Amino acid sequence: GLDGQELWSANTLEDVRRIRSGDLTDMMFRKPANRALGILISGDDSRSFRGFGKTNSPEAFGHNGAGGQLCWVDPASGLSLCYLTSGHDRNDVRQGRRGVAISSMAADCAG
């Protein structure tokens, strides 16, 4: 939180993190989309396809952005990560691999 104050109440956090996409499948990866209110939920073993590391907890949530930006919070570990670049990587494969590697390393350090 900010200056020791909560940013979101427990009820708000629970509501925002509720998966609302049902059985919607991500068209690119053919995995459950796990979409909540403006964020993605790490969830099951397909979390790396959603921009999270392979070692984030299922409770982690966040969103990736254009060109390789990513941001997530993992309530289980207390870790949050924001990765910003000054460029736009147009190689989707490299961009995805880098995001998963950075997220996995960060989660491993917290674990």
Over which residues does each language-model region extend?
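Catalytic loop of the DD-peptidase/beta-lactamase superfamily, centered on the K-T-G motif
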Residues: 1-111
